[in-house]
Amino acid sequence: MEHITPQELSTLLRKNKINLVDVRKDHEVKQGIIEGAIHIPMSLVNEWLPAQNIDNHWVFYCHVGVRSAKVGLIAKNLGFKNIYNLSGGVVAWCQSDFELIKL
């Protein structure tokens, strides 16, 4: 698993086909989500992740990057190869002057 900065994520979103997954709780997502992300709460990851393509590029994020790092390790243990964690989560994303969108 590779840890990436908000700037690196912004570049990946513009250039590559990646799967961006917000693993925060429902009440946290009400504040906004990174455009292009899907919301899969961490509590559902163990059920959802095994059905996904392990060869795709996956970026996980949460509030500050702790929960998403745990999800990245789960993905790695399932054989996923291209896993990224947004260091600092949405806090770092917003502090870097990137926006969240409302669902």
Outline where the language-model segments fall.
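Short, surface-exposed ligand- or partner-binding patches at beta-edge/loop junctions that are enriched
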Residues: 61-62
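Rhodanese-like catalytic fold shared by cysteine-dependent sulfurtransferases
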Residues: 1-19, 23-57, 66-103
